[in-house]
Amino acid sequence: MRDAGSEFAWTFTGGQEVASGYRTWTGACTPATDKIVQYGEFVLLDLHGMYGLMLGDVSHNAIMGQPDADQRKVIDAYVKTCERIVEVMRPGKTLGEVGKNVREFVVRNGWDKFIRGFGHGIGHAGHEWYPTLTDVKIPHCTNPDYVIEPNYMQMIAVTANQVGVGGLRMERPLLITETGNELLSKMPFEPWVIER
């Protein structure tokens, strides 16, 4: 989209989403404020591009300085969950199978108290919630029986919100191919470390 000449033109918050510190663990939309970023805090960036009437949604994270032990636990859980989604999103599987696999992975590792949700649709609306990537059936929101086929695109998303520690958010477009998938965003899942 960027190469085609996209613009920043849509958002839930009236601007791009930027949050730091305690504002990263709310798990909701995060409009920019006058809060000053502090050393040792997570910084969350959620950018919304548009080309024509097709929308994009990419989130990434940074940390100001090296993470402490608690932040490292959140980072590790977040990165491993992101990698798990990419690993299991394959043609021929259902969204419910993928959601169940990732949910069981999260629960098995003890992360279910702070990792929720795994993806949403994207297209003409910023959050086309149908079909949400989950193993739970919610009317007008999910279809766990939807079979993933080549050329299907899902906005994979992970939020890891630990109150008192910080929050991370990943949103990336994942294109299903004949043999697997391709992440259309090349940013790493690991947060950028920004030193003073």
Positions of PLM-derived features:
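Active-site neighborhoods and metal-handling regions in enzymes and metal-associated proteins
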Residues: 1-196
